[in-house]
Amino acid sequence: ALPPELVKPFTQARSIMDGHTPQILQLTLARFMEDGHYNSHIRAMRKLYAGRREIMLEAIEQHLQGIVRAARPEGGLQIPCFLEPGWSEEHTLRRALSAGVQLPGLSRLYIGEEKQQGWLLGYASLTAYEIESAMLRLANALRQGKG
């Protein structure tokens, strides 16, 4: 590890050295795009994420019915889930964390008086197994902590 007194000088030196992208990398990326590889990559990622989104929506429907109502997003990598009446965002976030599922709350994203309660569920980096496992753990933690 770098001694604390050297962190700032090294950070400044590194920012000077890395101030621009080398031409060879720019040319490589240009060729990658010209040859259609970028578009191919985008198509593959859209297909991958659409599949994960469907798996997440199915898992929400199967395990969290009566707790949240999921909105089907047209894009993005997160699913907004709105809490059903009788469920508190603060309480559900604590219960989720106790089950090893960290969720951002929806209410903090709203300006004004009428804030929706719920969470955002991300799926970009998760496998089908991880999605199913997380939704099952989350549902169990929420249902056990309801009373």
Name the predicted role of every residue range:
Residues 1-147:
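PLP-dependent class I/II
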